[in-house]
Amino acid sequence: MSSTRRMQILRAVVEDYIRQQEPIGSGALAAKHHLGVSPATIRNDMAALEDEGYLTQPHTSAGRIPTEKGYRYFVNSLSTPIPLTAEQRESISSALSGSASLQDTLQRAARILSTITGQYAMVSAPSLSRSLMRHVELLPLAAHTLLLVTITETGRVVQRLVSTDTLPNTEQTQCICETINTHCRLLTFRQCAQSIRTLPTDSEGGFTPQLRDAIAAVFSDMENEERPNELFTSGAASLTHQHIDAASLAPLFDALEEQVVLMRLMYDLTGQPGQEGVGVAIGSETHTPGLLHASVVSSGYGQSSTPSANVEHEEYDTGTKPTMPIAVIGSIGPTHMNYAVTMAAVHAVSRYLTEFLRVGHNGWQE
């Protein structure tokens, strides 16, 4: 589509339809928007947009509504991301402050995202396999058993038993921990296992080949035993107030139960280029039958490429951006959702979560 005027008309139709969920006529566009042409010219342009697949006419005498192609063009080329209001930013900050645990934080994040968008919100727990190791401790439990306590960058605390032929003393255990922390900090569990296997052993210092290999094996096991991410949700009831066709609601709610499918979709969307870390799937783009009349907006959160960000004042295209998201956050609503607001809200909450996890919180033990 090359006509600037047609682009303006498409944008006006999408924005007006998002607001009122009623077919948009040429007369209404001429009266409301300063397009500089007559209703007849607008009507001709709308007919051309319909021929090109961007608009459709639900009834012969009615105006036009956007198609999936129209929404996609709007999201890619027309929708101007907007910063959240000071009140919305403060509500996010307040919601994520003072939580008792990581689970509590993620549930709060889902609730505040649902509140801002008026839609269904999903927040996944950090993936263990994607997390980075912050610190390890070794604690003696029995004659041939050590407790390996691993803390990730997200504050997740993982405890595993390590069997050893010879139990190192307290001083030796401390030295072993210091060595592992020096070589493995900010590595994934897989990288930790690989790094530990290359460390020189010191049998006199308690770091025997058997103990080294046992610790490396524990990290490998933690990498391989990854369970499906826990998903925190909020706002399912709000979808019943979103002008979604009644026949589409049951399949939509069925789709929301398929958490593994939703997780895979959200992770796929985080890799979309050109969306400032926010991915959007519209209708059939979700490849999920129950979401044919819905859209999914998703972003990753977690380990960031920069050490800090002033998230209190960040806008849509600034702030801490995850280099390798360890979890995802998303919003599901009708295809006529307010994309600009939803994308900004998903982006903002994901950045707040990234910063919140970086600064630290109470550990999530398992």
UniProtKB/Swiss-Prot annotation:
One of its GO terms (molecular function) is DNA-binding transcription factor activity. It comes from Bifidobacterium animalis subsp. lactis (strain AD011). Negative regulator of class I heat shock genes (grpE-dnaK-dnaJ and groELS operons). Prevents heat-shock induction of these operons. GO terms for biological process: negative regulation of DNA-templated transcription. Keywords: Repressor, Stress response, Transcription, Transcription regulation. InterPro entries: DeoR_HTH, GAF-like_dom_sf, HrcA, HrcA_C, WH-like_DNA-bd_sf, WH_DNA-bd_sf, WHTH_transcript_rep_HrcA_IDD. Belongs to the HrcA family. NCBIfam families: hrcA. Residues 298-318 are annotated as: Disordered. This is Heat-inducible transcription repressor HrcA. It comes from the Bacteria. The keyword Transcription regulation applies. The lineage of its organism: Bacteria, Bacillati, Actinomycetota, Actinomycetes, Bifidobacteriales. Residues 298-309 have a biased composition (Polar residues). The keyword Transcription applies.
